[in-house]
Amino acid sequence: MKKLIILLFASVLSLSSINAKAKSITLGWAAWDPANALQELTKEFTAETGIDVNFEFVPWPNFADRMLNELNNKGKTFDLLIGDSQWIGAGAVYGHYVKLNEFFDKEGISMNDFSPATVYAYSTWPKGSENYYALPAMGDALAWAYRKDWFDRPELRSEFKAKHGYDLGVPANWNQLYDMCTFFQGREIDGQKRYGAAINTERGSEGITMGVTAAMYAWGMEYENPNKPYDMEGYFNSPQAVEAVEFYRKLYEDCAPPGHSDAYMVANLDAYKSGQVAFQMNWYAFWPGVSKEDSDGRVSGFFANPKQNVAAATLGGQ
């Protein structure tokens, strides 16, 4: 059976042509909460088609190696693959992914049914073209969680307002975020030393990029001249972009917990759940689990990436 792969997502759905008589198919993705939700959703698919869905979920640290090896070796483990959006270009150029326009037309799949940002980032190659190599499986974005129970303490609210002149709460911009992080840095609460924020610093994969671009986008950085593709000089290294990178570094140096120099999703979650930090940056996909696990007096609040010069956030993988 010939494979027809669709990339899908910061995660990208890779689809294979599936024999209508197939009794089961296998889907591969990363091991995390959204995969568990997808497992529930596929029950409807099985009830409607009679086709069982098997799953192989790979831990995030091993995910890219496992999936890319599968593609490079033309493996037959998966019928569907939810991979990373960063793979679309190489997948299209080196023949791992098939242009799906005719398939979409035949099956009545309209890209107008998807968020334009996810179509641009997760489906097209070259970006912005009408050449579709994937369907967006999950358009995740970067946001923040904070210890609302600490923020609601009258003594902390009074102290913060006396020092900064505004209320302790959801930060309106990155300057306020920094004020709040430094306010909690090294502070003792309930007999334990606390810190400001768990932010992305991991350098082995996309971690640091996903973190620092959250600031760069908020400062108004653009990757390239919007009227001239791949003309990056003066855009990606604009004064706003440089200021954002310097600010992110300052936030790390002044507000991160000890040893948080190579951290990404799991490390940020652990720092937050263990009570080390007042804030964590992470993906929206994790917030239901964080809220569900609130205990021992912990009350979590959530907010979108703060604006600085503009309101913007990092789209997963982008």
Which sequence ranges carry the predicted segments?
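Bacterial N-terminal signal peptides
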Residues: L7-S16
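Extracytoplasmic/periplasmic substrate-recognition and gating elements
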Residues: K21-K23, A47-E48, E130, W150, ...
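Extracytoplasmic "Venus flytrap"/periplasmic binding protein-like
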Residues: K23, E40-A117, A121, P154-E155, ...
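Extracytoplasmic "Venus flytrap"
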Residues: I25-E40, V58-P61, D140
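Hinge/lid segment of periplasmic solute-binding proteins
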Residues: S85-A145, G207-G211, F302-G317
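A ligand-binding cleft/hinge motif common to bilobed small-molecule-binding domains
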Residues: I88-A92, Y284-F303
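Extracytoplasmic/periplasmic solute-binding protein
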Residues: S123-M138, L142, N173-E233, V277
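Glycine-centered hinge/linker elements that transmit conformational signals in sensory
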Residues: Q176-Q185, A214, W219-D262, Q308-A311, ...
